[in-house]
Amino acid sequence: GQINEETEYVLNRFGVQPPGYLSNIGTQVKDMDIRLSPEANKSMSLKNAWDLMQENSIVSLPIREKDGTLEGLITIGDIAKTYMDTTDSYLLSRARTQYQRIAETIGGKVIEGNGHGYFIQGKIMVATANPDKMKEYVEENDMIIMGNREEDHLQAIEQNVSCIIVGLGIEVTEKVLKLAHEKDIIIISSPYDTFTISRLINQSIPVKYIMKTESLVTFNTEDFTDDIQDVMIKHRHRAFPVIDKKGKCIGTISRRNFLDMHRKKVVLVDHNEKDQAVDNIDK
């Protein structure tokens, strides 16, 4: 409680600042083993996010602003769900996916055009028919996954696709490169076959397209563990972001962290009793 007049006089006499008032000494979130989160931003691809989570053995990844504040959250389950949904051929354009990210995800590189541009319109197609048949299903601004036939590449350029992806590391002819350059068509070369490319390509979309940004359940480092247990039980998440005093996200905690909390150590002096001491001294 508040210091009495005698104590205040002695402290003033010797120029000592009075100790801070402490009403509760219970275990807090900052006393838990907070799992520090690796740096992750909303522009990174799902594949990069997945790799980061695997490397750090985590199931939830906080997405942060440049100043460290929490912007969203993505889980392994979110990524797996997107990976399994392979029927949406417009996914990459709706997610405004960068060509460079696409190239990285399929282990390739941009060999023609501006890799920093974005795929914002059209669907993804695998070209398996002859050039005449392509006219029936390939539309302007589509992204086409193709093999090594020059006539197919030329037909795709004639139909004004936005991007051509060539598999198996096959070299594209100078004629194709020249025409693609004239029409601002991106060409990406990948060492993988068309089947593998079509399986991997959805992982190139940016994290921001699927991350959760609303109704996030977070805890503060100053929160008492007694207060957060019921919240954790109510929301059956695998991990919860932790925010420090400066409003920055520093990591995550889970229910398992209750097993290894670092309880505060207290020394009672002046014949003090527990029932006369600060709240939660026995916790």
Question: Where would I find each of the regions flagged by the language model?
Answer:
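Short, small/polar residue-rich loop motifs at catalytic or cofactor-binding pockets
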Residues: 56-58, 234-237, 262
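A glycine-centered beta-loop-beta connector
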Residues: 32, 53, 61-77, 232, ...
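Long, charge-dense
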Residues: 89, 177, 182-212
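Bateman/CBS regulatory modules and CBS-like beta-alpha motifs in cytosolic regions of diverse proteins
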Residues: 20-52, 64, 99-111, 119-150, ...
